[in-house]
Design a protein with these regions (language model features):
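Beta1/beta-strand and adjacent pyrophosphate-binding region of the FAD-binding site
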Residues: 2-16, 34
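Helix-loop-beta segment of a Rossmann-like dinucleotide-binding subdomain
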Residues: 5, 87-97, 109, 122, ...
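Flavin-dependent oxidoreductases
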Residues: 19, 185-288
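Glycine-rich FAD pyrophosphate-binding loop
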Residues: 25-48
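Dinucleotide-binding Rossmann-like beta1-alpha1 core, especially the glycine-rich loop
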Residues: 52-127, 131, 138, 252-254, ...
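Short beta-strand to alpha-helix junction loop
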Residues: 61-72, 96-105, 142-161, 314-324, ...
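Flavin (FAD/FMN) cofactor-binding core of flavoprotein oxidoreductases
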Residues: 126-129, 218-223, 228-230, 303-379
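Helical element adjacent to the flavin cofactor pocket in flavoenzyme catalytic cores
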Residues: 141-195, 199-206, 388-399
Length: 409
């Protein structure tokens, strides 16, 4: 049963909601912490459908939160997996150049890595062949030794166990319904919450608007799918990624080494605009109001060509199907053929934040809050990697807001 009162109420049971709850309990051990998750278990959305790649942190400019938090997040999550005995593959990542036009992008990634202290190695084409014989590159490539792979569902399950051990009330199957005079309305009754922490992912903007925030922001969902290699298909020793278009928050179709010890791979993801927030498969979870609102917004972006949306949409159409994905991946790794990739993995939804005033996608983490509530509005990749460091950073921001109130009183 839901408690009638709680000091901190966290909405959302993904990896960030769990680490936020744990960090709140660690810093305010004498306070009660309750977490709401509308699904029957935690981590059934973005966290459980994550690629499992622990990013090193060299994609981001030094002035961003992503750059500040990813390197430490990588270290802490890898150490957590070792401590708990969870699967961890320190396979590294190659970023390859498809042609001469990609070389300046490689140089920029190396510069960003140096600025944020992320270890990187610029390799010649011969060095690349020794590291991963199947990788294809033009002249040179960038290698990230700190990039790794984990099993997201096992990480989430371990954090749920940690929350239980810390006396955090984890309420699954209990949905947030809104804010009222008596407290927070949920599907299990009203909870009088001293402070609300919103980590609701796809619905973070809706929860935030109940508290007067997210006025200029809306969640724009993107569907991501991977193709899985058939059993016995050739594997790779390391992840192989293209040089991304740094103006957009997507890393492009890549070849990802899966856990399991055999080097088996998956290729993807797609990045198709979704028409409703939980458009995973078929018409399940269809919401007409969401579909109408999101479709109208996407048509407007196409008409205005916001942030190069037309080019992004056209590129996605070319890689949306199985053959398109295989063709893009074959440009990165030799020996990738359609016959070896017949199965789709679970669909994931990226809860990408859109600034509706400036008509642009938010590239960095975004949050808003006051002395009554705090809202994590943009927690997209690499938020899984950053979970521990991001939670520590955000709880510090929450503490500052609470300290102002305490000092004033």
């Amino acid at each position: 049963m839901a408690p009638r009162t709680t000091d901190f109420l966290v909405v959302g049971g993904g990896i960030l909601g769990l680490t936020l709850a744990l960090e709140l309990k660690r810093r305010h051990g004498d306070c009660s912490v309750t977490l709401l998750e509308k699904e029957p278990a935690c981590g059934l959305h973005a966290s459980g459908r994550n690629s499992g790649v622990l990013h090193a942190g060299f994609y981001y400019t030094a002035d961003t939160l992503k750059a500040r938090l990813t390197r430490e997040g990588n270290r802490r999550l890898a150490a957590y997996c070792v401590e708990r005995g969870l699967p961890l593959d320190r396979c590294g990542k190659l970023v390859v150049a498809r042609d001469a036009a990609d070389l300046p992008g490689l140089d920029e990634l190396q510069r960003r890595g140096r600025a944020t202290g992320v270890p990187l190695e610029m390799l010649s084409a011969d060095d690349v062949r020794r590291l991963e014989p199947r990788a294809r590159t033009h002249e040179r490539a960038l290698f990230s030794p700190r990039t790794a792979t984990v099993q997201p569902t096992e990480v989430v399950a371990s954090l749920v166990a940690d929350a239980g051990a810390a006396d955090i009330a984890v309420l699954t199957g209990v949905a947030y319904r809104g804010r009222g005079r008596g407290g927070v309305f949920t599907s299990a009754g009203t909870i009088d919450a001293g402070y609300l922490v919103n980590a609701a992912g796809l619905y973070a903007d809706r929860v935030a608007r109940d508290y007067g925030f997210s006025e200029r922001y809306r969640i724009l969902p993107f569907r991501g799918r991977y193709l899985l290699a058939e059993p016995g298909a050739p594997g790779v020793r390391t992840h192989v990624y293209p040089v991304p278009a740094l103006a957009n928050p997507f890393l492009g179709v890549h070849v990802t080494r899966r856990l399991g010890g055999d080097g088996a791979v998956k290729i993807g993801p797609t990045a198709a605009p979704a028409l409703w927030r939980e458009q995973y498969d078929g018409w399940r979870n269809f919401r007409l109001d969401e579909c109408l609102t999101i479709a109208a917004r996407e048509l407007g972006m196409l008409w205005r060509d916001d942030f190069g949306f037309r080019r992004l949409a056209l590129a996605e159409l070319r890689t949306h199907g199985r053959r398109g994905l295989v063709r893009r991946a074959a440009g990165l790794v030799d020996g990738i053929h359609p016959a070896a990739f017949r199965r789709w993995g679970s669909t994931g939804i990226r809860a990408q934040l859109l600034d509706v005033r400036e008509h642009r996608l938010e590239m960095d983490f975004r949050y808003e809050g006051d002395d009554r509530s705090f809202h994590v509005l943009n927690a997209v990749s690499p938020a899984f990697t950053c979970a521990f460091s991001l939670a520590a950073y955000l709880v510090q921001r929450i503490g500052e807001r609470l300290h102002v109130v305490a000092a004033a009183s």
